[in-house]
Design a protein with these regions (language model features):
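Bacterial signal peptide processing site
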Residues: 15-17
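Active-site-surrounding "flap" and adjacent substrate/cofactor-binding loops of secreted or lumenal enzymes
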Residues: 23-26, 39-44, 48-116
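Hydrophobic/aromatic-rich, well-ordered segments within soluble, folded domains that form packed cores
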Residues: 34-55, 186, 190-209, 567, ...
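Noncatalytic, helix-rich "gating/capping" subdomain that lines the substrate-entry/channel surface
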Residues: 87-378
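Intrinsically disordered, low-complexity linker/terminal regions across diverse proteins
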Residues: 220, 226, 255-258, 276, ...
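N-terminal low-complexity, Pro/Thr/Ser-rich intrinsically disordered segments
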Residues: 19-31, 35
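C-terminal motif of bacterial Sec signal peptides marking the signal peptidase cleavage site
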Residues: 11-13
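Sec-dependent signal peptide recognition
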Residues: 2-8
Length: 669
């Protein structure tokens, strides 16, 4: 698994959401049958809003978690599968058309029998090239080839908006190259990490044996451990300043003198210009490995990176072993998803805007886009009002914060300009070659943006994606069509339900512009302080309250959230709920209504939020989240923010001593 370093994309993404199957009616309101009436809303609102649903909906064997959102997300992939099956069934699409590209890619992916018959054969030419590595110069050529395949071995290389001049795109280097989820899995002594290392050792040995590799799995693990020792931990990675190391090309050469960056840049057709090195310490360690690690050890490591990346799409023994370690052991998943669903995910990954264009034509009506744009507009207005009424911020900082809200760039549904995939050459009978072709094209596309003005039309997610994000470098909030579906959003739902579900997501993403990361970027996306000293101290004190709150949330005895790791998402949840609620109150004043479900409109808003966030998560997945995911687990994404909101207490008439009323509330925005 490669590590995401923040300045490559700087995406603050919310958790996944979902869409109903074609043969199910749209759910336009809260689900009364999912409530647990035995649970008092003022004692445990998560159980009250989700208890019956959770009791009646076990996690499917192929999933690491389950919820209404995830259920609809999987049904959404079934919609992609319908499109793909239709396109791949026809073989005479015009040459170069997106229908032919997408259809042929899916046809190659779906031919599991051919993959099983071929075994390792599709990968043998690449493994043979790597097996020929004998000198330090050969190692560097191999690293360049793997970079072209979008494999971080061991560093990641990609574009980013310059954090000091976001109007231009520069190159960025970051740490990568690990096979375990993060550095702590290699270094920490706790039993779960020790077990993971033992399982990973066994996994390496099994995969090497399947591929007939004679390289040393022990040397590969030792190599990765040294990389881990040089990497920042997950909390440090959340601070943009820890990743901000701009330098000219010549300084990079001095930092890592044993790597031929001139040849690397020339091979990637990248200009030798200024760049950002996210983790200079890691790059120094990389340079030491070039000096001290033998070509034979490098050879084994590089072959492993290619094998690990390809295994899910090779024959059954490789695919099963990859699944058994990465999904079954690490995530607790019992079985693979159906091949068609996995192929839909792969096509979306590599040809996402081509497939996405077909998706929005069929499933995302103009009325839905217009309604979401209206919600976004209303919530940006609400955020401005909240800032203007803060009692702890000086007028000087308020003015800059309001200006930042006014310069937000919302994107809804799909891009105005679609990407042209005509340069991607797809064969109907060569899956691994198609994957390599898609990755090479994506890398070349990214390299082509470096040294040029930032493309503000670019989307960091594909239209069918069930997610959303805020990019601080561009001060933009992005909501793909894939998230704008029930239960997150329904054009026919009440304001209470829409503001309580997608509205809180919108508020969450807006609030990322003012969380512990986003607050370090100004309205133009520059990484620079825009706060007075007094206001910054107030902000940090208030965010520390949130971090301390989440430090106290345990998923099992001895295992709790790291409040600093989840701080940005927790601020987003708290402020996002407040922003959405204020916008909802204004909508309610303009268009009063009385719900037919026995709740007040305000209560319906909070039930919609609780049900949107409710889910089931396997313990193994929760442990992964606790370790490296900046999002809290679902239960704490409900009770955490709501227990701080006076609006919630008032809506449910909660006594001051209730469990859902914190005695010392955290209040940031």
């Amino acid at each position: 698994m490669t590590r995401r370093f923040a300045l490559l994309l700087a995406l603050a993404a919310c958790s996944k959401t979902v869409q109903p199957a074609a043969d199910q009616p749209a759910q336009t309101g809260i689900q009364l049958g999912d409530l647990d009436r035995k649970a008092a809303p003022c004692d445990d609102f998560y159980e009250f809003s989700n208890g019956t649903w959770r009791a009646q909906n076990p996690i499917p064997a192929s999933m690491d978690r389950w919820s209404r959102r995830w259920q609809s997300g999987e049904q959404n992939k079934e919609k992609l599968k319908i499109i793909l099956d239709e396109l791949s069934a026809k073989t005479d699409w015009p040459a170069g058309s997106i229908e032919k590209q997408v259809g042929d890619f899916n046809a190659a992916c779906m031919d599991e029998a051919k993959a099983d018959a071929l075994g390792l054969a599709p990968l043998k030419p690449m493994l043979a090239e790597l097996d020929a590595v004998r000198t330090p110069a050969d190692v560097q050529v191999a690293i360049r080839k793997l970079t072209d395949l979008n494999i971080a071995a061991p560093f990641g290389f990609g574009p980013t908006s310059d954090p000091h001049e976001p109007s231009r795109t520069i190159a960025a280097l970051g740490a990568g190259g690990l096979g375990l989820p993060d550095r702590d899995y290699y270094l920490k002594p706790e039993p779960r990490f020790v077990e993971a290392r033992e399982k990973y050792h066994a996994h390496l040995k099994t995969m090497f044996a399947l591929a007939g590799l004679t390289d040393s799995p022990e040397q590969v693990f030792a190599f990765e451990k040294r990389l881990a020792e040089a990497s920042l931990d997950n909390v440090a990675l959340r601070n943009p300043k820890n990743l901000d190391h701009p330098m000219p090309f010549d300084e990079l050469v001095k930092l890592t003198p044993h790597f031929d960056w001139v040849a690397f840049y020339k091979a990637g057709k990248v200009e030798k210009a200024d760049l950002n090195v996210a983790e200079p310490g890691f790059m120094k360690a990389f340079d030491r490995e070039l000096q001290e690690t033998s070509p034979a050890e490098w050879r084994g490591y590089l072959k492993w990176k290619v094998l690990a990346a390809s295994a899910p799409w090779l024959s059954k023994p490789f695919a099963d072993e990859s699944f058994n370690f990465n999904q079954k052991f690490l995530g607790g998943v019992g079985e693979k998803k159906p091949r068609g669903v996995r192929c839909a995910e792969l096509t979306d990954q590599l040809l996402g805007e081509a497939l996405g264009k077909k998706y929005v034509e069929r499933y995302f009506p103009p009325a839905a886009k217009a309604r979401v744009q209206e919600l976004v507009k209303n919530e940006l207005s609400a955020m401005k009002e909240i800032i203007e009424h803060l009692d702890w911020m000086t007028p000087e900082t308020k003015k800059k914060a309001v200006h930042k809200v006014e310069t937000f760039n919302p994107k809804v549904g799909y891009p105005d300009k679609w990407r042209d995939y005509s340069g991607v050459h797809v064969k109907r009978d060569a899956l691994l070659a198609n994957i390599a072709e898609g990755q090479k094209w994506e890398v070349a596309f990214e390299h082509g943006t470096m040294g040029k003005p930032t493309n503000r039309d670019f989307w960091g997610m594909t239209p069918p994606t069930s997610n959303a994000y805020y990019n601080p470098l561009l001060n933009e909030i992005v909501f793909p069509a894939g998230i704008l579906i029930p239960p997150a959003f329904d054009v026919n739902a009440s304001d209470a339900v829409n503001y309580g579900a997608i509205g809180v997501v919108i508020g969450h993403e807006i609030s990322h512009g003012f969380d512990d990361q986003g607050a370090q970027f100004d309205a133009d996306g520059r990484l620079q302080n825009w706060w007075t000293e007094q206001d910054l101290k107030q902000f940090q004190d208030r965010t520390s309250c949130v971090a301390n709150q989440y430090d106290g949330y345990f998923i099992k005895p001895g295992v709790h959230h790291n409040g600093r790791l989840v701080l940005g998402e927790s601020i987003g949840d708290l402020a996002g709920a407040r922003v959405a609620y204020l916008a909802f109150q204004k909508a309610l004043a303009a268009h009063p209504f009385k719900p037919a479900d026995g709740f007040t409109p305000e209560q319906e808003f909070f039930v919609a939020w609780g049900q949107f966030r409710g889910d089931q998560i396997r313990e193994e997945t929760q442990l992964l989240m606790i370790q490296g995911d900046p999002h809290p687990v679902a239960r704490f994404r409900v009770i955490g923010p709501l227990s701080n909101l006076t609006e919630f207490q008032k809506a449910w008439s909660c006594p001051a001593q209730s469990a859902m009323v914190r005695p010392n509330r955290c209040d940031v925005w």
